[in-house]
């Protein structure tokens, strides 16, 4: 039950934040550089909220192993679905740019509101730990998701297109980009590199781009 899940999350928060102090120096340094105008008390409040969010995310993610499609859809509200379904039909696919926020993993339920023959594509970075990598692939494919490792994104999307498949391509776009393909700009007072893969794929495939805004209530 979700009530038990969030009780466990509260315990996990205490262990992670108070006992283990997981990456606390890194988080505090980032908050100080991003919000120098805020007081120590204000930054501390943000810090604690972040760790509570992180703990909830971890437990909610594991819950996906056993949630039904009905349970997932009951806890997710999708907006502008008519528009992206219409453009998927018209162009053969769209790009959805997704942030690391509000349990983005639950977006795997999008497959339930798409046409059965269309493909929800998830581009991911393979994890070094093979067990965790297989676990996350299992979670992300439960509701028809098609997992593509980032190093073969273009090749796999072109193959799907040639096979006559229409698709929604989900990309986590707020990660630090590897290699030389990146765009630099000032973000939260710091020079920050952004991925440009979504733009490249959109231009190559002539896919419209959606920016996904997530919120948690």
Residue ranges and their predicted role:
Residues 65-217:
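Soluble catalytic domains of membrane acyltransferases
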Residues 1-98, 103, 133-138, 144:
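Membrane-anchoring hydrophobic helices of lipid-metabolizing enzymes
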